[in-house]
Amino acid sequence: MNVDLIFPNWPAPPRVHAMIATQRGAGPSIDRASFRETLALPSEPCWLRQVHGTRVVAFDRQAGDERATATRDFLPPLAGEGARRADGGNTATKADEPDADASITRIPGIVLAIQTADCLPVLFCADDASEIAAAHGGWRGLSAGVMENTLAAMRAPRENIMAWLGPAIAAQSYEVGDEVRDAFLSHDPAAASAFTATRPGHWLCDLYALARQRLHAAGITHIFGGGLDTFTDSRLHSYRRDGAHSGRMVSLVWILPASI
């Protein structure tokens, strides 16, 4: 399994570890069987069946159990969720993977995972390493409130939470229709600043700017990352560039146990 790694440039506490893994030469299906061993992860990643929604799940683990399980559910999914796969994907999922687009945990050793190939992965952590979260920011989920729902599920005060914006398609590569712009402007007219007109009914959409805007409005001031372009960077997977043959990047975050 050949993997390239990107490490977030953020001032996370030493006990919080995070990375973006890109499997070279891979198609839509990630080699999960060797994923943990290759990356020396403390446990199997907690995969989600991402559906471009706003549902958040919490992962917990009973003492002695190897596999983390989703034990709590924060906020119901959007009406009609579950029919649409994230990033147009065909990535294989298991029946016990929850339909959700964000997850949180406060348990050291549990690895949260988000898969993307143009959409925006966002990682969160409390500055005391007490909890972490990971969210999938496709335009549907982002406009509908997946970031706000993720923050609502976290216990840490907003001023003690930091966010890192992972690799996503950049504005110059992401032309969208009126329906995308309208979805954001219906929530906040200020979102208009993240769209640049190209031709009638079409706009360049800045996912990074939209995420920062929503996070700032939710009380998050410590925001990092957000400068890559999956479409033009050959290291990164892009569904818009490569279509159904595109691979997936995996954003991972976990808490190390406290020193004894």
Give the positions of each predicted feature.
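Active-site microenvironment for binding and transforming phosphate-containing groups
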Residues: 1-79, 84-260
